[in-house]
UniProtKB/Swiss-Prot annotation:
SMART domains noted in UniProt: HATPase_c, HisKA, PAS
Protein name: Sensor protein SphS
Signal sequence annotation: none
Biological process (GO), any one: cellular response to phosphate starvation
Listed Gene3D superfamilies: 1.10.287.130, Histidine kinase-like ATPase, C-terminal domain
Subcellular location as annotated: Cytoplasm
GO cellular component: cytoplasm; plasma membrane
Organism expressing this protein natively: Synechococcus elongatus (strain ATCC 33912 / PCC 7942 / FACHB-805)
Length: 413
């Protein structure tokens, strides 16, 4: 900031010396007046820059400024704390200052796309004192890289540890409540079954309704406990083995056939005869059971469920879509959240009046199963049918080579 003031004074002094030395007929006073008129503007620029520096320094989010060669030019207070940076001038390569390959890749993507890029990862800061062997605590972060002028990149890094801690506390609380509810619900169900055996006619109808609600609550408790286990990540999985996705989808279809048959729903599969992933067979079955069951509940009578399986590199991609009404745009960001129920107009009247509506946990469980298997799941509306479209991506089982005979894609009722 003082550089502007210094340059202005230097320019003024130079003009006076030049005029005195050469006794130039050029009128120096108008030139000096023009230079002096810049002073208020330069002072305002200086003030704005100081405010900008103060704002960046006190931001609760970590900020880094990189030049065109990925040298770190600036780091605010939050960045120095989060990244364990020494209080010194930087002007060193990013990977030397912040040893995070995820951050380096984020910046590279930003430069390649010339557009803001966002990513999440677990950051492990490097201890600035090489004599201290105490490891730094890994922290979940979210980073955003923003392209600026002259090849510079602005990087914002948010520490998500508090959010993760709150989510873990919530999950522990839900798990504890579910455990506490499991035993009394079992007792109520057993008592209701014993009471039903002793009653006849109209009172038995009320007991049957009581049993139905008890079973629904019991399933809700089981789903909550399942979610808590799956949120542990891969450690929440049980036996890992080679699982054939095609055989798994066939089993799911057979299990849900009694639900689809009254609606005369077709099933159109296109893909190889086998496709192996490494995973927990029981959890993967639950994944597809939830997705196909959800599709059946929202499909019109006489409609069709479409399943397409293909391989891309070392990943299996499975698309499941229908020709129903599709997702509401307002629902798309929240479909995989716990207890979220979408637009009721999507549900068929018969399904909407069912005595055993969904718990709102089916898609949340599906997402956790996919993420526990290091995969990805996404939802949108299909561009051709207009129906709901769910895409699941899972890593291929590396030890098995799938058959590549492609199905005909024919419909079967």
């Amino acid at each position: 900031m003082a550089a502007w003031e210094f340059a202005l004074g230097l320019l003024t002094a130079s003009l006076w010396r030049w005029a005195r030395k050469w006794r130039s007929p050029v009128k120096v006073k108008p030139m000096l007046a023009a230079v002096s008129s810049l002073e208020p503007q330069l002072e305002q620029i200086t003030t704005d820059l100081r405010d900008r520096d103060r704002l960046l320094e006190d931001l609760p989010v970590s900020f880094l400024l990189l030049d065109a060669d990925n040298l770190v030019l600036e780091a605010n207070r939050s960045a120095r704390v989060l990244l364990a940076l020494p209080p010194e001038d930087y002007c060193r390569p990013l990977l030397e200052v912040v040893r995070s390959y995820e951050l380096d890749r984020l910046v590279a993507r930003c430069r390649a796309a010339n557009a803001p890029q966002t990513d999440r990862w677990t950051l492990t800061p490097v201890n600035p004192d090489p004599l201290q062997v105490v490891p730094q605590t890994p922290r979940p972060v979210q980073g955003q890289a923003i392209p600026l002028s002259n090849g510079q990149i602005g990087v914002l890094i948010e520490d998500r540890q508090e959010l993760v801690d709150l989510a873990q506390q919530r999950n522990r609380w839900v798990s504890d409540v579910a455990h506490e509810l499991k035993t009394p619900l079992t007792s109520i169900r057993l008592l209701a079954e014993a009471l039903r055996d002793r009653l006849q006619d109209e009172p038995q109808v009320w007991v049957d309704r009581l049993l139905g609600e008890t079973q629904r609550l019991g399933q809700l408790v089981q789903d909550l406990l399942e979610l808590s286990r799956l949120e542990q990540g891969p450690s929440g999985l049980q036996k890992l083995e080679a699982v054939d996705l095609v055989a798994l989808l066939t089993s799911v279809r057979n299990s849900l056939e009694p639900l689809a048959e009254p609606l005369r729903l077709g099933w159109a599969y296109q893909g190889p005869e086998q496709g192996f992933v490494r995973g927990d067979r029981q959890r993967l079955f639950r994944l597809w059971l939830n997705l196909v069951d959800n599709a059946i509940r929202h499909s019109p009578s006489g409609g069709c469920l479409y399943v397409e399986l293909r391989q891309r590199g070392d990943t299996w991609i499975c698309d499941l879509y229908d020709d129903g009404p599709g997702f509401a745009d307002a629902d798309l960001p929240y479909l995989f959240e716990r207890f979220y129920r979408g637009d009721p107009s999507r549900v068929r009247p018969a399904a909407a009046s069912s005595s055993s509506p969904g718990s709102g946990l089916g898609l949340a469980i599906a997402r956790q199963v996919v993420e526990a298997h290091q995969g990805r799941i996404s939802a949108r509306n299909h561009p051709v049918t207009g129906g709901a479209w769910l895409r699941v991506q899972l890593p291929q089982e590396p030890s098995l080579t799938p058959a590549l005979k492609i199905g005909t894609g024919r419909r079967s009722g």
